[in-house]
Amino acid sequence: MFGHAPEIPLFPRPLAAAMRLGPAEPLGLPLTLIARRLIARHPSLIGRLGEYAQARFAIDPTDLPLTLVLHPHPTRTRIAVHREAPATDARIAGPLAALLGLVHGAYDGDALFFSRDLVIEGDTSAALALRNAIDDAELDLGAEIAALSGPFRPALMPLIAAAQRLTGVSLTRADDPRLSEEPVT
């Protein structure tokens, strides 16, 4: 039988409400840049999607007032940010912490699905292909973002580790040795 999903931290409501004040679309540019870097560093992600490499995926953090739409492509991957979820091939919805935890291997996807903390709609085969591609790549979003920060990387990793400890949200891979109890500088 599947394990019980742990209690998942939710994004603070006041911060989520504040996100409603500005436009969502400009968030797409930095997210697209991060996604393109991930694809460049992990080109097998696109290949692993197989027949779903042209699918559009809605990633819907249910505790935030926006939806991310992933358009995978070997060189032109794009993430668009919308207030309302547009029509896509597959929609994966759940609290932001659960979605990040799936990427980092901190949560069991089956347990989240059967506990209804994670909802899959549309083409479930496409969603499964995306999940398998991400699992195989062993992505570390915290490390990828830190790498983008150039000379600030040494200072950023301890900050990411501290934020992870304080919030309980998986911001990097669970097995990342850089998340030792380093002091925040």
Predicted features along the sequence, with ranges:
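Feature captures hydrophobic
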Residues: 1-185
